[in-house]
């Protein structure tokens, strides 16, 4: 079973996460940020990754530290659960619609972290959640998971729909890229014989 648990504690946040990459999307999320919990719930359910996230942060200041640190911890958990990445499909490309919005998410589980994020929001906040934090979370996740991740919203108007299409797109891309390809016969999908360098 490809699973991992991470604890991260700083002066700003106290976070515990766990993932099972071969799960069914069983999810337990509690960050204290309603909209963010909703996005993480979508991520788990549509990726089919079993996911637990418990976070206590300095929400009296703002949501930045909690959002970013959850991205760091989840990224670290996914990377740890992947191990040497033997047998994975590695690549995936998804177009994710959400009503009037369409977002493209392309992923390479390469061990080389990179984020290209081309998404503009129609307003600064979704409820109390700053829309700029969507990029902050994706960056923290990609850097710590060690994945190359391209997220581009091709068009869209509603800020909630734009964010949701990004998270659902990532979920479906992870579901495809992390899947074990039986044709790989347990080999690392790289001509180098290893990923991450």
UniProtKB/Swiss-Prot annotation:
It is found in: Cytoplasm. GO terms for molecular function: imidazoleglycerol-phosphate dehydratase activity. InterPro entries: IGPD_sf, ImidazoleglycerolP_deHydtase, ImidazoleglycerP_deHydtase_CS, Ribosomal_Su5_D2-typ_SF. Keywords: Amino-acid biosynthesis, Cytoplasm, Histidine biosynthesis, Lyase. PROSITE patterns: IGP_DEHYDRATASE_1 (PS00954), IGP_DEHYDRATASE_2 (PS00955). It is an enzyme of class 4 (lyase). Pathway: Amino-acid biosynthesis; L-histidine biosynthesis; L-histidine from 5-phospho-alpha-D-ribose 1-diphosphate: step 6/9. It catalyses: D-erythro-1-(imidazol-4-yl)glycerol 3-phosphate = 3-(imidazol-4-yl)-2-oxopropyl phosphate + H2O. GO terms for biological process: L-histidine biosynthetic process. Its EC number is 4.2.1.19. Transmembrane segments: none annotated. Belongs to the imidazoleglycerol-phosphate dehydratase family. This is Imidazoleglycerol-phosphate dehydratase. It comes from Bradyrhizobium sp. (strain ORS 278).
